[in-house]
């Protein structure tokens, strides 16, 4: 959960912490009878490793911003894609595109392609990981981007990575095909 909190937000009458409110919302959503999503969060991950069965506690990132509103971006996802996470600290002369194209085939089908690649560039290892996860909250607008053309280096990278990864032919569920990333 990514939360943007306006500096002028007032929490009058709140009886729970914001973490508790978010976790209660996640708990209620995962316990709905019509929920088809798998619960995949563990209590005591270093010990008994029992499933909480409601995907709490949620992983929450906060950002304080100007204004008087609160904005939530929630990814209802399991941990399988996290298991395929890769991180590297590249030298300035190394190619980001080459590293991604070399790395995607090593992930096998466990990330359930076709999918999205969250790529965080810059900062510390921790910052890059958060940037990568946050990038997955963006709209899938690659067709619009291709139509209008890239306007900066990040947009050029997005198109180049998509084209080269799809050219690998990994396809749906790793069984081959034209579309590996969206």
Predicted regions and their residues:
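Residue-identity detector for threonine
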Residues: 15, 50-52, 56, 103-106, ...
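Conserved mixed alpha/beta catalytic, RNA-binding, or beta-rich assembly cores of soluble enzyme
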Residues: 9, 16, 20, 26, ...
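Short, well-structured alpha-helical segments that form the helix of a local strand-helix-strand
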Residues: 22, 157-162, 166
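Flexible, glycine/charged-enriched surface loops at secondary-structure junctions
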Residues: 31-45, 106-118, 143-153, 168-182
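Short amphipathic alpha-helical surface micro-motifs
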Residues: 40-44, 52-58, 98-100, 163-168, ...
